Amino acid sequence: MKIRNSIYFPLVCALALSASSCIRDEILPCPPLSVRVEVTDKNYFNVHETDLEEPVDENLSFTGYISSLRYTLKNIATGDVVERKDVRNFTSGEKSFRIDFCDTLPHGTYVLTVFADGRTEKPLTFDETGENLKLHPDSSEGGDTYLTTDTLVYDAWSYDYAVGLERVKGKLLVLMESLPSDCAVADHSVKGLYDHVTPSFIYKGQSAVMKSLSVSEQDHASVLSGTLLSPSAGGGESVFSLSLKDNAGSVLPGPHDSAVKVSLRRNELTLLRYSYGSGGKLVISLYVNDHWEVVHGMEID
């Protein structure tokens, strides 16, 4: 989303303007192109439907949501990259980050793309083209990434814009209850995820994520894991698997590696619950429509 402020000069001033530029020796210089980068997705869409994820304060400064960003301004007519910059240290306490481009920038139509990392302090990783953001480099979880892309028309009347960063990934929360006493590690595997996102906010490719969670004795009663994940590839379903291991790295006997199909979406929380009982009993539930529904095998009951 972008907001444009248009300034209309009096007729006498308008006659002094050429079709493409200001006559700088007769009037004040044309204002430079300026863009305020704001955060649109401060919370997950469904964060208020569960108490397993704490909502974020909606009134923080920009640095309360974003730790680093990269912006790119590209000229549509020529395809040239006019400016690209990485920003890691924000000094302002404002609720937006302002980009002021050089006042010698020619009037024209541009595309502004901003990739950003949330408060995860993870580096932004791009593919070999340097354009597309890798969402799960080396099958890792990666950071809490944001993106905005907008077309900006820059002329004597249109030069002040606002754009909003939107969260690229969702989050999978897995609640594990009554874990076996010899459980030391919970291995997570998620297959069927998008691999990268383009500057046009189009998801492409396929990837998988592997993650290990150390489990202490105090966690056996109940432990919660959270994993940042790209949406399910093709708009379909991803497959989540959980495997429990002991201190020696051996997989524990019993139905601990049951797989579940889940639909992962950007800026949404997906909740699973693994409840272990005596005799190797395992009940898997998926949180749907404000309540837990038991999952049998790969289907919801």
Predicted regions and their residues:
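Solvent-exposed loop and beta-edge segments used for protein-protein assembly and interaction
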Residues: P29-P31, T63-Y65, T104-G108, D155-W157, ...
